[in-house]
Amino acid sequence: MRRRAFSFAVFLAFAVAGQTISSQAVSDRPADVRTAFARAQHLKHGINASEWFAQSANDYSAARTNRYTDAADVALMAKLGFDNVRLSIDATPLEGWPHGADGLNSEFLGRLDKAVDAMLANGLAVTIDLHPESSYKEKVRTTSEGVDRLVMLWRRLAAHYATRDPERVFFEIMNEPEVSDPYRWAGIQARVAAAIREAAPRNTIIATGPNYSDIQDLLTQQPLADGNVIYNFHFYDPHEFTHQGAGWGSAWWSYTHGIPYPATESSMPDLVKEVPDAATRFQLERYWLDHWDAHRIRLTIDEAAAWGKTNNVPLICNEFGVYREHADEQSRMNWIRDVRTAFEADGIGWAMWDYRGGFGVVWKDDGQPAKVDEKVVEALGLAK
């Protein structure tokens, strides 16, 4: 979940050239496609279990992971009405010592197994989301050795989890690949998918576009030859609103607070005047003039839905959300509701980012019971 950088000219070039990004015709694999559509029904209302086994490179110890999210949290996810969990997993600790017979870190993998099995026991589908740090992705982007490493890791990981229920265990090739060349990513993704399929013949794969998995990245791709695949994108538009106050990504985000959604003629002028520097003021003025509201969001998500329909493949969006520390609460709920309803209108399953992090549906301290944000639950349409 990062800042997106995108050139419209490059997009147009690849949107045309993308017709040559190869795959066999979808009509050649109707049975597998039907399986993917059927299993996508297990991924309708999801939540991201972030910063547990990924995004915490300084500490993947049992002492931390056992307290960060626990069995009570998994049970709460199911109780709140989520039907699936996207479990983010860093690649590096999987490859570390001590190695088991399968070449994976047996101690770390044992803790992962416990989490996956708890989710399955609570009736939740699980996406095994390979979620490496940018340094790992850089090697994939720039070297053949990095790709070989990724393929081998997935061969081992898929074989390990192929023993679980294939109806409810999904394999996501890589979170936000940060590979800017759509052609290179198409080749990498096809190779990884083939390795997964060899190791796990029955499981459904989740594929994505290059870069940061935005809608425009998805549109550069053609379906894989493998029919048992669900296609994924992420949605955080407009970043001026969803990432206000964030201390990562674009530097100016950290200086913006209280940006309303939707932007109105009455709410924006005074806010823009308070911004001292011209560059940040320009960003806020652009957000205001772009008229982001439920209609604009629906039109944007319709573009992804049209790609899925054209290619006869199921779609999910397994990241969307608003950084909550500096966002106006009601505006945050407005955005979550509008995005969620747009997904559902287009038949697209979703997974909100995230459970207890900066975009969370609960507040929680390590080792303590979670406190549910009932307004988020309501905005997600899960309130009974």
What are these regions (language model features)?
Residues V26, V33-F37, D148-D293, D302-V322, ...:
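Active-site region of glycoside hydrolase catalytic domains
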Residues P30, R67-A71, R298-I301, M333-I336:
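Structural motif corresponding to alpha-helix initiation and N-cap regions
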Residues E325-K384:
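Aromatic-rich peripheral "rim/lid" segments of glycoside hydrolase catalytic domains that contact
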Residues S7-A17:
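Bacterial N-terminal signal peptides
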